Each structure stands twice: as C-alpha cells, then as structure tokens.
Amino acid sequence: MTQLTNNFTLEELTHTDHREYENVPNETEKANLMRLAEFLELVKQLLGNAPIMVNSAFRSKQVNDAVGSKDTSQHRVGCAADIRVPGMTPDQVTKAIIASDLQFDQVIREFDRWTHVSIPNNPYDKPRKMALIIDKQGTRKYS
C-alpha cells in the first residue's frame, strides 16, 4: 500500500468499482492526489477526527466516462473526492466545510448522499470556494 498521509492511501483514492478499466494516475495526478489527501486530513480534523469514507477520487478517462461525468471533472486530475462521514449527513459535512477556513475549491452536497470536495487543479491558484447543491432539481448555489 502506498501511504499518502496518515489516514489516506493511493489505493483508497484510486479505487473504482469499474475494474474493467485501468485507473492509474500519472505523476502529475499522483502529486494532485497527495495534495488532496493532505486536504482530506484537514477535513478529518475539522470534523473531530471522524472517519472519512472515500466513494470516489481519481478517475481515469475511461472510469469518468463510465460513471457519466464531464471531461472537466476535477476527479479526472486527482483534485476531487466524493466522501461520506459516518454519523454525519452530507449537509452537516458541507456546512462544516463552508463555515471553516479550509481552502476548498468546491464543496457540493450531491443528492443528499455524499459530499464532493475539491482543491484547485493548479496548486498556485486561489481556491474558488464554490458551495453548491446538486440534486434532482438541478445545480444551484448552496444556501
């Protein structure tokens, strides 16, 4: 196992149920996954060291296409993770991240099932701090 941080491994951030497709990041994507793992450690601390379950992080083009996501998805470059936190709702996780001083690029409550968190694709870019909701009504600003 390749440990990226104390609590997150490369295998965890590249896991996919679509095993028929290769899901191996290149060196740039691995560097992004390291930054993402460091960010997830901060989220974990923010949430009182609660366990974070990663549903999806890095996605190769084939995996991304298989799940029906856009080519511009930050998952494609290793800068996004869809997470669940046992004992917390996605709304609670989203609110906690928004209220914090964490430098997130996006936080999205998706279908009340998970929280999408991302960091800037370029480590030198300023985080956009976009807070959104995606559900059957569409995409809108978090309020």
What are these regions (language model features)?
Residues 53-55, 80-84, 116-118:
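Structural recognition of the beta-strand scaffold that forms the well-ordered cores
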Residues 23-27, 69, 127-130:
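Short, polar loop/linker segments at the starts of domains and inter-domain junctions
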Residues 1-48, 137-143:
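Extracytoplasmic cell-surface/polysaccharide-interacting catalytic and binding patches
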Residues 39-50, 92, 96-101:
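Generic non-transmembrane alpha-helical segments
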Residues 41-68:
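Extended, low-complexity, intrinsically disordered C-terminal regulatory tails
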Residues 85-143:
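Catalytic cores and adjacent binding grooves of peptidoglycan-active enzymes
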Residues 56, 74, 106-110:
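Short beta-strand
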Residues 71-92:
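Acidic, His- and aromatic-enriched active-site or binding-groove loops in soluble protein domains
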